[in-house]
Regions:
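Acidic, Mg2+-coordinating catalytic modules of nucleic-acid enzymes
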Residues: 362-372, 381-552
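Conserved nucleotide-binding/hydrolysis micro-motifs of P-loop NTPases
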Residues: 94-96, 117-122, 152-153, 292, ...
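Conserved catalytic network of the ASCE P-loop NTPase/AAA+ motor domain
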Residues: 79-83, 104-107, 276-281, 308-312, ...
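Surface-exposed acidic, glycine/proline-enriched linker/cap segments
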Residues: 62-78, 349-368
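Conserved P-loop NTP-binding catalytic core
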Residues: 42-106
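Extended helical coiled-coil dimerization/tether regions that scaffold
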Residues: 187-270, 274-285
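Switch/communication elements of ASCE P-loop NTPase nucleotide-binding domains
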Residues: 1-48, 245-366, 381-385, 389, ...
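Electropositive, glycine-dotted interaction segments
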Residues: 93-214
């Protein structure tokens, strides 16, 4: 069984949206309040008829209606014809019993629907209510009916459902209630069916042993000896559980500690692994919120590795704010929920492979940012931030511009992700002494993508940011000396001060910052950039750095 797509109508922030999914893994990413969790909630409602772990009909409130739909209703005459309909339609594959044409596409397809609409049998009652209460301020859900139907328009029964979907959320475990239905659901995933049968029989036999114990018999003998309560025999006995209910009387323990009292991170870890392992072999789909929550990086690494290797053929839906999770589970499984909806299923396989091997790249920043500047080192980042702050009296990130330091294969990787998503990316690149070869020719590779722009000095002698900054401040000795005074240590400045003329002082500075393999001058660059960032010098800079902030 696979969920191919879901159609949301008037559900929370989604007025009319259709989301297509991957058959294996779906990783929802987006800003806070973008709607990632809302899609998971919709899946839980339509697949399990459950909302936040409880039956949907008992949790149904006016708050789940789309605000625009509510406002349209409140602005109308509020008659029954203007009451909004809420629908969640899941198009699925592998369940032919749910085939029909009752879906928004009117297509012959397999699927199920949760339909929330006005109950026509209450039409007259609602009309009378409207006469006496014309100033309705919310959706009158008391006049609605909730239906769970397949695409053939047949009611879906939970006990006879043709698939099983599990939603993992440790926050649903109440710390004091202990043995609840949620834990019993997790237990079901941990036990084979034959194991559950054996446990049930053994549990019931032990109940009978308890009932026949001497202590219980003694209590029962003296319970109503004079028959003042009833003329019949009154006794105390262990409750006999119906078949299938034993799970509610059992609990998971970790190192002898009840599951509901262990740490949230371990709860999440155990639940996810049990669901993925699924000894009962009856789970088709697993949903989870931010598996990285409450986990250290090492434990997250172990968990992601487990999911990656043990998922089998289960379809997985999860939300995350972790670049590590999405890189390791495959970045081409991203479902970006932000100013629309976009999947990265067409991302180049080489990029996917690189990020699986090197999952530390913070690719999520490229996915979530609208404006990105890629730079080669932290010194570039500091200088750019100082320039921007000088002009605007605030840092670029305060205006939604994210400066990301990348190295080596990072440029191509980040640019590939940005090309697929459409993120506007300006790349500040060193020309390394050959502008034509290292910049002009590379630009040609991205000519078809107007959202990608490579920026560099066109002068070969300005081979990186440091010489470009030095040339910009070498207009005269006073300006260059002031610049050198800030970026150099006192000891180095004394050496610089012994150099006789402007050109030689400029060359001294360029050579001082020139990096070659293994000379460790990167630290000098960062130290000097920090001094510029923290200082008050109104230094000069090359004009191409202004272009870095131009996203027009």
């Amino acid at each position: 069984m696979r969920v191919k797509s879901i159609k949301l109508t008037n559900f929370k922030k989604f007025k009319d949206e259709h989301f297509e999914f991957n058959d294996d893994v779906n990783i929802f990413v987006g800003d806070n309040n973008a709607g990632k969790s809302t899609i998971l909630e919709a899946l839980e409602i339509v697949l399990n008829y459950s909302y936040r772990g409880r039956p949907f009909n008992s949790e149904f409130t006016p708050d789940i209606f789309n605000k625009d739909a509510v406002q349209l209703f409140l602005a109308s005459d509020k008659s029954a014809t203007h009451l909004p309909v809420l629908a969640i339609e899941a198009f699925i594959e592998g369940v032919p019993e749910y085939r029909g044409t009752n879906n928004f596409l009117k297509a012959d397809a397999q699927g199920i629907t949760v339909l929330v609409r006005f109950d026509d049998t209450l039409k007259d009652v609602y009309a009378d209510h409207l006469l006496t209460n014309p100033h309705i301020t919310s959706i009158p859900i008391e006049f609605y009916k909730l239906e769970w139907l397949d695409f053939g328009w047949n009611p879906v029964k939970a006990v006879a459902k043709k698939f099983r979907a599990l939603y993992i959320d440790p926050t649903r475990i109440h710390p004091t209630l202990g043995k609840n239905q949620y834990i019993s659901t997790i237990l079901n995933t941990a036990l084979k069916k034959e194991e559950l049968v054996k446990l049930t029989l053994n549990y019931r036999e032990n109940q009978q042993v308890f009932n026949n114990s001497g202590e219980v018999r003694t209590v029962n003998t003296g319970l109503d000896t004079d028959h003042l309560i009833t003329e019949k025999k009154l006794s105390i006995a262990a409750s006999t559980l119906p078949a299938g209910s034993i799970q509610t009387s059992l609990q998971l323990e970790v190192d002898d500690v009840p599951f509901q009292f262990i740490g949230k991170g371990e709860q999440s870890n155990v639940q996810i692994k049990l669901a993925i392992q699924n000894k009962s072999k009856d789970i088709d789909l697993v949903m989870m919120e931010e598996p990285e929550n409450h986990l250290s990086h090492i434990n997250l690494n172990k968990l992601v590795h487990y999911i990656e290797n043990q998922r089998g053929d289960k379809q997985l839906f999860l939300t995350t704010h972790s670049s590590y999770v999405l890189n390791k589970l495959s970045i081409d499984k991203i479902c970006l929920v932000q100013s629309g909806y976009k999947r990265l299923h067409k991302l180049a396989p080489a990029v996917v492979k690189t990020l699986k091997r090197l999952p530390g790249y913070d690719t999520l920043r490229v996915a979530l940012s609208h404006k990105v500047i890629l730079v080669e080192g932290p010194s570039d980042e500091l200088v750019l931030k100082k320039i921007y702050h000088r002009k605007h009296n605030r840092l670029p990130e305060q205006d939604g511009i994210d400066i990301i330091v990348v190295r080596g294969v990072g440029f191509d990787t980040f640019i590939s992700v940005g090309m697929e998503i459409g993120t506007r990316i300006n790349v500040l690149r060193d020309n390394d002494g050959d502008y034509e070869e290292n910049v002009v020719k590379v630009r040609a590779d991205y000519a078809a993508y107007p959202n990608i722009k490579l920026i560099s000095s066109a002068k070969n002698e300005e081979f990186s940011l440091e010489p470009a900054m030095i040339y910009a401040n070498a207009t005269d000795l006073v300006t260059l000396d002031a610049f050198a005074k800030v970026v150099l240590s006192t000891q180095t400045f004394n050496l610089y001060d012994k150099v006789v003329d402007l050109d030689k002082r400029r060359d001294f500075l360029i050579d001082w910052f020139r990096s070659v393999q293994g000379n460790g001058k990167g630290a000098r660059k960062v130290d000097s950039a920090i001094k510029l960032f923290d200082g008050t010098l109104n230094f000069m800079y090359p004009p191409f750095l202004d272009e870095v902030f131009d996203f027009a």
